[in-house]
Every structure is written in structure tokens, then in C-alpha cells.
From Swiss-Prot:
Signal peptide: none
Species this protein is from: Mus musculus (Mouse)
Tissue spec. comment: Testis-specific.
Stored Gene3D superfamilies: 3.30.70.330
Segments passing through the bilayer: none
Main location, first listed in the record: nucleus
Gene that encodes it: Rbmy
One Gene Ontology cellular component: male germ cell nucleus
Start-end of Basic and acidic residues biased regions: 180-190, 333-351
Note from the entry: The RBMY1 proteins are encoded by repeated regions of the Y chromosome. The exact number of functional copies is unclear and may vary between individuals, and some of them may represent pseudogenes.
The keyword Amino-acid biosynthesis is assigned to this record: no
PROSITE patterns (alphabetical): RRM
Record-linked InterPro entries: Nucleotide-bd_a/b_plait_sf (IPR012677), RBD_domain_sf (IPR035979), RBM (IPR050441), RRM_dom (IPR000504)
Protein name (database record): RNA-binding motif protein, Y chromosome
GO BP terms: hematopoietic progenitor cell differentiation; mRNA processing; RNA splicing
């Protein structure tokens, strides 16, 4: 629609760049008094841009000029004359001028034309007026590549870098998001993987040697009334323990009785220091308690117990009968006999050595510590 505040304003396009403003005023002044003539020029080069705006004082004069001058050749070019209308894309501040496409006039107008670079602005998009009809519509020629430009991109080519940075940042964010999305999957796999047994179960399955402390078998029989364990569960490798028990079996005269209940697992570590005090009186707790002193020592059957693992045939039978005393020290160590007898008993159960040694060594004895054999056995 025509401008409401200036109804007599007309648009003249397709002018030759050599046509002057004074020439336009003389030619169009024949239709009526002219109020104002504006020839659009480039701000840097000061050259004509090929179109102008002319304002008549009366609306009727403007309409006559449009009918008469539209399509007339002026300075070698056919001009286009029509009623000036305000373009919808223009701001309200620029009422008297069509959009300017000069490089220095403003980046916003160049951006609205869809051009992004400063080098492109020098050539400038051609804004030719479409004279077919009663409205002026600029024609913007797009480059042959058919590229679509962003509307609000800064004309400076230096500003083209931030989109690439943002794209790299977004790609990194997507990669990080992908990594975070795969973490629960790894945790799920780790939860489904078979786990090894706890260290405690492996320790219980393979107990330590008895020289170093109480094993799982000792803990197994701690809850019994006397704290004794089954001697038959121990292997023949514990030869020193089997010899000690075979010696004690001699005091009992080889009675066919299971002597596996005499000592707990702790007694294997605490054995030999009170070995010579077996003649002492029984404790107040009962007949079996005379062996309690036997489990209070801290020697174990590592090196300090060797003096007590000697020839069984000479420990009690000959020494007690010959001396008649109640306190006899053990004889010196016979290592050859210990090694030889250990080799003989290897491969047999400790219970076999227990009874064989008792029958061989003390079958002829009738008294122990001055007490008849039968009465002494009843005390146990």
C-alpha cells in the first residue's frame, strides 16, 4: 500500500548511473509541483545505485506521472515508475528510503538479503524492482551454487569459527554422554561375572600346619566337654605326637581303648615341658586331670620337644624299676632310633603305633609309680 503520510511519492527504478537528480526533477516537474527528489547513492563510492524516489505535492500529479513515464527510455535505459510502497521488511525509522544494500550502510540490511561475507557485500546482491504490478518487491539473486545463507549471521568471516567450535563441543558432549550410557552396562557385566571364594573359605580349606597355631580341626573340637580332639584324624606325618601318645599308652598297659580323646589340639603345641611331672598327685578336678600339666607347656613339637621323643623302651620300664625314685630325667636323645622308627611307622596310622609300642614296652610291668596296674588304670 502507498505511504499514508506521503501519498504523492513514486518510485523510479532502472535508471542509468549517469542520470542526475536535477534531470529527474526537470522531467517529472512537468506533471506537477515536485516537493522532493531522492537519488539513491552508495555511501562509499557516491555513485548512483539506479533508482530514486520523487514526491509530488498532490496525489493526482503522482498518478499521472506513473501512467505517463512507466516504460520510458531515459539516458539509454528503460525506466520503471510506480507508486512507492513501504516494504514490510523495513523498519519504521526509514520511511523515505528503500532498503540500502551498501556495504557501509549497515550489516542488518545485508543480512536480510541473505549474504554472509564481507567480500560478497562488495559485489552486493542485486535488488531490482519488479515493476509488474503496483508493488515494488526487491529481487535477490542467489549465487549459482544455490547455497542458503543464515538470516542473522555476522558479515565478518571471522565469526564463522564459533559454529565449528560449538559443533565440536556438542560432539564431545555426545561422546561423553555415550560413555556415561555404557557405564551401567559394564557394571552389570561385572556383577554377572563369577566371583572368587572369600579368603576365609580358602584358609579354612587349607589349614596352616599345627606348628604355627590352632587349626580348623582344633576349633572343630573346642566345644567338647574336655576340649579333646580325635587323634585318629591326624596323619602319620605327625610322628612326634604319635610317639608321645604311644609312651602314655604304655602307662595304661596297652588297654584296648581309644586314646584319641586325651589331648586337644592345643596340647600338640604345649606338650613336653611338664613331661617329667607325671608322678605328681592328681588335681582336684578328676582322675584325667593329671594330664592337664601336660597341656600347659609352650614348646610344641618343633625343636624343643626332641629330648622327650626318645627310645620308648627305656623311658619308664628300665629307669623307674632300676632307680626306684619318683623323679627321673629322660635319657639322652637317640636320633638314629628316632629316624629309624619314624621310617618304620611311616605309612601306618598313629593308632597302630600307639598300641604296638604299649604292648612291647610295658607288657611285663605290674606297677607304675608304686600303684598297682589295675587300680591306676581305674583312676583314668
Amino acid at each position: 500500500m502507498a505511504e499514508t503520510n506521503q501519498p504523492g511519492k513514486i518510485f523510479i527504478g532502472g535508471l542509468n548511473i549517469k542520470t542526475r537528480q536535477k534531470t529527474l526533477q526537470e522531467i517529472f516537474g512537468r506533471f506537477g509541483p515536485v516537493a522532493r527528489v531522492i537519488l539513491m547513492r552508495d555511501r562509499e563510492t557516491k555513485k548512483s545505485r539506479g533508482f530514486a524516489f520523487l514526491t509530488f505535492r498532490r496525489l493526482a500529479d503522482a498518478k499521472n506521472a506513473v501512467k505517463e513515464m512507466n516504460g520510458v527510455i531515459l539516458d539509454g535505459k528503460r525506466i520503471k515508475v510506480k507508486q512507492a510502497r513501504r516494504p514490510s521488511s523495513l523498519e519504521s525509522g526509514s520511511k523515505k528510503r528503500p532498503p540500502s544494500f551498501s556495504r557501509t550502510r549497515g550489516a542488518s540490511r545485508i543480512l536480510k538479503c541473505g549474504r554472509g561475507g564481507r567480500s560478497r557485500a562488495r559485489s552486493g546482491p542485486s535488488c531490482e524492482g519488479n515493476l509488474g504490478g503496483d508493488r515494488y518487491t526487491p529481487n535477490f539473486n542467489v549465487s549459482s551454487s544455490g547455497r542458503h545463507f543464515a538470516v542473522k549471521r555476522n558479515p565478518s568471516s571471522k565469526r564463522d569459527d564459533p559454529p565449528s567450535k560449538r559443533s565440536a563441543t556438542s560432539a564431545q558432549t555426545r561422546s561423553n554422554t555415550g560413555l556415561r550410557g555404557r557405564e551401567p552396562h559394564r557394571r552389570e557385566i561385572s556383577r554377572n561375572m563369577p566371583r572368587g571364594e572369600p579368603a576365609s573359605s580358602r584358609r579354612d580349606e587349607y589349614p596352616l600346619p599345627r606348628d604355627y597355631g590352632q587349626s580348623s580341626n582344633d576349633r572343630k573340637y573346642e566345644s567338647t566337654s574336655r576340649g579333646y580332639c580325635d587323634y585318629g584324624n591326624y596323619h602319620s606325618r605327625e610322628e612326634s605326637a604319635s610317639k608321645v601318645f604311644s609312651d602314655h599308652a604304655g602307662y595304661l598297659g596297652g588297654r584296648d581303648r581309644d586314646f584319641s580323646e586325651y589331648l586337644s589340639g592345643n596340647s600338640y603345641r604345649d606338650t613336653y615341658r611338664s613331661y617329667g611331672r607325671f608322678h605328681e598327685a592328681p588335681s582336684a578336678r578328676g582322675g584325667n586331670n593329671r594330664y592337664d600339666d601336660y597341656s600347659n607347656s609352650q614348646d610344641g613339637y618343633g625343636g624343643r620337644g626332641e629330648p622327650y621323643i626318645s627310645n620308648r623302651s627305656n623311658i619308664y620300664s628300665s629307669d623307674y624299676e632300676r632307680s626306684g625314685r619318683q623323679e627321673v630325667l629322660p635319657p639322652p636323645i637317640d636320633r638314629e632310633y628316632f629316624d629309624r622308627e619314624g621310617r618304620q611307622e611311616r605309612g601306618h596310622s598313629p593308632k597302630d603305633g600307639l598300641y604296638s609300642a604299649s604292648r612291647e614296652s610295658y607288657s611285663s610291668n605290674t606297677k607304675i609309680w608304686g600303684i598297682p596296674w589295675r587300680s591306676w588304670r581305674k583312676q583314668i
